[in-house]
Amino acid sequence: MTKLIFMGTPDFSATVLKGLLTDDRYEILAVVTQPDRAVGRKKVIQETPVKQAAKEAGLSIYQPEKLSGSPEMEELMKLGADGIVTAAFGQFLPSKLLDSMDFAVNVHASLLPRHRGGAPIHYALIQGDEEAGVTIMEMVKEMDAGDMISRRSIPITDEDNVGTLFEKLALVGRDLLLDTLPAYIAGDIKPEPQDTSQVTFSPNIKPEEEKLDWNKTNRQLFNQIRGMNPWPVAHTFLKGDRFKIYEALPVEGQGNPGEILSIGKKELIVATAEGALSLKQVQPAGKPKMDIASFLNGVGRTLTVGERFGD
């Protein structure tokens, strides 16, 4: 039985962890995840999905604010683990820790070398990729730069957003890891170096990147909106107030970018630099998320054709 330390944080990671727990070839000695955080307006302390899964399985849990140089790292190195599996952990692993293991692999939610970084699923959508995927790679000190052990792809559809793709890729990552790990541990797989000429980066989304620029095409804005749904959520401004857009569809239309072209009982069409967007799910300032019909029947009922979204 191979003894593992698992490191991860969000639901994606929890799915991978639960997969490992179903396989009796592995023993999880410890789980490392990010500390509990205060979430929302009420600052409710929330455990990570990985911590919740680990508690359900009765596993030892470590939550260092920073792994490097921590007492927790020293404890982990004394457990006698054969290797480390990480999946969206959110911290760099110190070389000292990596060097103490027989192996360390990462489950990364992109088709490396494309989309290294913390937001690969977001960027796959924002940049209009036709496919997404998961790469199992060896851990090195440089971010997502290790040799690739295996990859698996799935198509991206127009119905996908961050939430749906997150769920799909979590299952892909779980299955790919379970399919790959035995042969890798046995030495039957020769990892492949990444082509550095093809590297792209997908860093965490910055607040200023959430803002919609109506001078882009309808397809670009469509991709940005779904590439931020359900988080962090793209926004624009309407009458000076922040206006979030969760869902929209590209449609035909022509007008000044940001201009309202037509209003119906269940339809609000806004011009872009090329074509237009039909808004489907929105959140006006100070209001809950709602479908476009509810918006137009409520706070949006005073809107008129020709008004503008934007600054």
From Swiss-Prot:
What's a single GO CC term here? cytosol
Does the entry feature the keyword Protease, yes or no?
no
- Report the EC code(s) recorded for this entry: 2.1.2.9
InterPro entries in the record, alphabetically? Answer: Fmt, Formyl_trans_C, Formyl_trans_C_sf, Formyl_transf_N, Formyl_transf_N_sf, Formyl_transferase-like_C_sf, GART_AS, Met-tRNA-FMT_C
State the disulfide connectivity: none
Residues annotated as binding (6S)-5,6,7,8-tetrahydrofolate are S110, L111, L112, P113
Q: Which GO terms describe its molecular function?
A: methionyl-tRNA formyltransferase activity
- UniProt record similarity statement: Belongs to the Fmt family.
Could you tell me which NCBIfam families the record lists for this protein?
fmt (TIGR00460)
* Role description: Attaches a formyl group to the free amino group of methionyl-tRNA(fMet). The formyl group appears to play a dual role in the initiator identity of N-formylmethionyl-tRNA by promoting its recognition by IF2 and preventing the misappropriation of this tRNA by the elongation apparatus.
Instruction: Tell me what this protein is called.
Output: Methionyl-tRNA formyltransferase
Q: Report the source organism.
A: Streptococcus pneumoniae (strain P1031)
Q: What is the lineage of its organism?
A: Bacteria, Bacillati, Bacillota, Bacilli, Lactobacillales
